[in-house]
Structures are given as C-alpha cells and as structure tokens.
C-alpha cells in the first residue's frame, strides 16, 4: 500500500536551521521547584507513590506504572514534596502531578544502582523499572515495544532528527556514542534480534563517522546514511528506506519485522544499564528567531517552560509571539509557560511576533505542490474536498489515516493555506467515524 501511495512522494527540502548543532549541552540552573506529571507517556498514567512532606532524591521512584502500557516516574531533583495535585495536560485531560521544592543538593537516591541483567526476563524487568519511553516524542513505553507479537529481525534506530531547529539527538550521538552502542547491544543480546540499522540523515557527517568508528568491529550493527529530506524520520518512511519493507495498513512496525527506537531512547537505555539512573533529565534544544542564546540545555524533568526559556533569554527588541514545544513543524504551540517539561520534550522554539503571525490565506490554485512534496504521497486537495463533504468512504480511499501531520503541505503551499490543520481535522474525523462504524 505504501509504495502505491508514494508514486510522487518527494518530501520537502526545508531549511534545517540547526544553529545549535555544535552546542554541547550544558546544565541549566536548578529551578526552585519542579512539577512532575504522572502521565508522560502513551497509556495509563502512573500512580503517585509519595505524599506532601515526603523527602525525595534524584532517581527516587515517585510514580508506579498504572498498567501494562504505562511507565514508572522518577524524581529529577532532591527536595521535599510540596503537593500531589491534579494538573491539566495540553490535551485537556487531567492527571496527577507531584510538585517538589528543590533543596539545591541534587542528592542521588541510594537505591540507584546498575540493574542485574542475566536473561531476557531480567532485561525486560529492568527496562520497565527504568520507566523508559520513546524519547522522540511519542512516549510509548519501551518495555512494551520490546515485546512484540510478530517475529522481528531488525532493530531500527531513528537518528534522522529531520525536525527544524532540533539538535538534541545530534548532541546525544556526538557525546554518548558508547551509551548508544551499549543500549543497542543489550537489545540485540536479550531479545534475540539479529541485526540493527542506525538511520542518520547525511547532513550529520560527524555523527555518521563517529558511529561508524564505534561499530566497525560489530557486524550486527549497520550505520546507514539517509537523504536529508523532511519526513525521513517518520516510522513508515524509515522502515521503507532502511530494511526496505512496507508496514501493512494499520499495522505496527513489528508487522514488517522491525522495532524502531529513537537514538536518545537507546542511549538512555545504555546509561541505565550502566548506572541505574533513569531518565530524570534530558537535553532540550532552545532556539528560534526570538531566542537570545540558542543552545542545548540539560533540563531536569518537570522544569517549567518559563524557567527553561529564561535561561536562554529573549532577544532584545523582539516581542515573543509564540513558543512551540518540540519541533517547529510538528510541535504544538504552548498556551501556558508554567507547563512542565517531560521525558519527551526535545525542544522549545521561541518565535517572534512577526514570524508567528498567520499569513494571508488565498484560494487554492490547484498547483499540486502539496501532492508532489507529501512524503506519504497523499493528496491534500482531494482530502479537503472529501472532508468538506464529510465523505468517510472517500477519505478512506484517499488514505487520510497515513498522514502524520509533518507540515510539508503547508510549507510548500504558495497560497499559504492551512493544509496541515485541515489534514489533521480530516484524519481525526475519519478515524472517529470508523470507530463508530459510520458510512463505510
């Protein structure tokens, strides 16, 4: 199906704007408090294990996975629990959060130690205990991902980092290559997957060279340069380009014999196996045309966006128009700067008022550029018409559910139409109707 769709799929050659690619991560000043969400992942929220007044340390488990598809949560700071209270997530739902007043000491919990791993069962138990989730943005629990129902012969490491401005994965590769290799080798050894492919866009030659050097005597691990075209990092496209396979419609990567892990995720796994320290902080790229000091910061999980942005600073004479969490193309706009960072926060993009101003929208001229540059080979113009008519059957024929909202159609549209937003609405409508069983 995917190959049929990609008859004209090119992907857009967008400006990379990787100004921080050489910015080695530095720790930000410790905030006065953090708010750690019990839902930082796909699946059931974790259940808080602490109460107001409890003393916690760096690495203390403060949330227990709330089901099979869930993840443990750990404290990113040492200090005292100030509150355990509901907090509204960016999607409008409520979940518990743990507010911790920091003591400035960053004392590590004595219980933090490297896990004893001897076989597959103990390996999966260690991964679950670590609370590791996909750090590329989706947040799917890693221990669940490593237990597929289908046979898998390829571990695929997504190191493409095609999003505009983001360079946190790049810095992870440059500074933590040994951790990446350690994590990969552990997955291969304990799951029985015979080989691994690391997919890296060819605009990161230093990363390619370093990982090639680190894996030159490891025949099970291949480093594969990829074209630096926007959308390469999407799972379906990555699987097509690396193992050269097609994921069945509606299927998971394992249905094509692959498991996909983000490069920072597998690096974090390598670190946990060596030290026992879970993901309590992460590298976040802070950039954008309104940012005074673009840089990569090491940020404790739960730090407010405001504290992170204050570290980077607002450019003089510039009015902040919008902040985007994640990449500028796919990340959501931030409504409240008090919102806390999570395990999956890879970047905060500061846009000036001029840049954030919506463009003048003009009528569609049917130039076909949205079709030409869609990495999935979809037809946004036709989808728009089908959605306007609420034609579920036609939306299905147009495969609207393949859209992953990369933003390419909006980027290349000369009429400045909000194609991506329309595709997102159409996809949500279609999936909702299919779930209800309507107009098939």
Spans of model-derived segments:
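Conserved hydrophobic positions within beta-strands
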Residues: 79-81
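Acidic low-complexity segments
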Residues: 83, 88-145, 149-150, 205
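Ferredoxin-type iron-sulfur electron-transfer modules in oxidoreductases and energy-metabolism complexes
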Residues: 345-361, 371, 375-440
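Gly-rich Lys/Arg/Thr-decorated short loops/hinges at beta-loop-alpha junctions or inter-strand turns
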Residues: 134, 155-169, 290
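Hydrophobic alpha-helical positions that pack around
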Residues: 193-305, 311-316, 327
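N-terminal, Lys/Arg-enriched amphipathic/low-complexity engagement segments
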Residues: 1-49, 99
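Flanking helices and flexible, charged tails adjoining ferredoxin-like Fe-S electron-transfer domains
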Residues: 103-123, 128-136, 164-167, 244, ...
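Short, well-structured beta-strand-loop connectors
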Residues: 51-64, 83
